[in-house]
Amino acid sequence: MAIFKVNGQSVQPEKNQKLLRFLRDELHLTSVKDGCSEGACGACTVIIDGKTCKACVPDTDSLDGREIITVEGLTEWEQQVYTYAYGKAGAVQCGFCIPGMVMCTKALLDENMEPTDDEIRYALRNNYCRCTGYVKIMDAVRLAAKILKAGEIPDDGDPNWTLGNRVARIDVEEKVLGYGKYPDDFYLDGMLYGVALRSKYARARVLSIDTSRAKALPGVEAVVTAEDIPGENKIGHLKHDQYTLIPVGSLVHYLGDAIALVAAKDRETAEKAIKLIKVEYEALPHVHTIEEAAAPDAPKVFDEEENNICAHKHISRGNAEEAIRNSKYVISHHFETPWTEHAFLEPECAVAFYDEDGDVFIYSTDQSAHQTLHECSLLLGTDKVKVQNALVGGGFGGKEDMTVQHLAALLTYVTKKPVKVKFTRAESLLVHPKRHPFYMDMTMGCDEDGNIMGVKASVTSDTGAFASLGGPVLERACTHAAGPYHYENFEIEGTAYYTNNPPAGAFRGFGVTQTCFATETLLNMMADKVGITPWEIRYRNAIRPGEVLPNGQIVDDSTGLVETLEAVKEDYDAAMAAGKPVGIGCAMKNAGVGVGIPDTGRVKLIVEDDEKLHIYSGASCIGQGLGTVLVQMIVTNTDIRQEDIVYERSNTWISPDSGTTSGSRQTLVTGEACRRACEKLDRKSTRLNSSHEWISRMPSSA
């Protein structure tokens, strides 16, 4: 076996394996993140003999005599520089990609202290970041180069932690240096690894399941099927329509449906066992398009439903048909948007175990710990369940639905041992809900000056194999389809269909993105037909405070569309005059639950034995920086110093439920709850001596 050095220490793996697995599973160097294991994402980047390399690519046997450096092997000075640079530049969000980016930065700056922008881009070319768009990461590289060349970190003085000031995030160090723990970074004594057997068909009936050969495989601790579930088998974000494990005699709805689970001593053994499970199916006709799903004789995705319609929405104001008929200009067009993958860098992972209270404890990476608690408790048939968010490597809506948490909990319940369930990137792509594909037919009428007279639209969406959030997504798509414009006549009819495709659910924009694309494109077409610029047609129709949107909402003073358009006009006109036209588009989106539903945020402030104020909230921090905002909120509204405040990650036994982290709502509603809790604290006290919980209930608007 090969002998090589890792961070200056000689090591000799006992077996040939991927370097990534050796670094993580045996040396527990968890700064080396596993984002894909396919040589694609760059989250596992290390330095080998001065050059960057993705650790998931080389086998350990190929590394004899080589020298490997991970973030853990950086000098103390280098760690300080990169923490400062990435924090100061605002380059860290979910943080999952950052250790890999740091290693790319080090390899570049070790050779070139004055890199050009092109050289920085080239150095980072193999590393993905889903959150930032790379601009801030490039800023961090430039700043790190400047500091390394100067030989000292700038003295910025004490930062001002009140709202409105720029500060480094409270979690920047643990994310830059890679010691902050995502669920996959937990290695517990005696931990097993869980893997699911998934359906061979998109639609079929399971006739029998034979697990005998899998159970006999050495290293297998348990093989679990539907009959082993102690509580409710079905889960679902709003509607419980998805089997955790498909029972014999029931239908599978898509290729991601799980049939059985295996818990084994390692993932390799679990994967071998999965292949030994024999499932007999009756393959059935399936539907993969809306046309197929809507056909009168279409196979039903759910036997118990009358048809394949998941949700229907109709909104009408004024008389759109008459307004369009009387318009000077009329344009009709068909638009389509595709399925879209969230592409968060951290694949779904959960670790479950029995804690000292005899509760099933789950470390999860999701957008609502309390939602996970609810569904796992129903599955296990017990309220002795706890959930805590570890670090979350991005969500964007894709981690609102259950994926791995309940599987880890079930295997722990059965085996009484710690269990880790982690998706491969291929599983993640298959299983978790995607952005809905939309098919839209839209007609717009305008007068001779380009003023919108009326819009009529018909939209359909493919919500896949389960309801997930298909109904609310359709509702947002329809209520926002009119755009941020002022006109009286609007009608839209929307239908979401079940198919045997992977489910579709929440994704940033939540349905608004799709119809906004259609409306804005149609508006550009109309501007061309009327003979005015895309800027001008938007300005003439822009909604102003006090006016009524086509969906019936009265706009308040917070709307600044006119001012925004005016602010860009000079640059827009200059680009057009220079023959370098730029695109322009307008959009509106609810902050919070939306459609008039009251929204709730909760915060609990507790002075612990360390005499520091601890912030507890059930709101998940998925990279958006909620913890930093809440700390700033307290500093702004009290005399408590930042160093006397501790932000606790969301859990379900102390942190009050603050709803799902979605809809850009947490700073608004949970932040307001935090502000109100601050009012209960003694602003003038030098010693913290109280604890308060406050609930913020706020009306939501589109």
Place the predicted regions along the sequence by residue.
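Signature of N-terminal electron-transfer/Fe-S-associated modules in redox systems
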Residues: 1-156, 595
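Short, surface-exposed loop/turn segments at secondary-structure boundaries that line and modulate
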Residues: 127-132, 136, 224-257, 292-293, ...
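Helix-loop-helix junctions that connect adjacent transmembrane helices in secondary transporters/permeases
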Residues: 297-378, 542-612
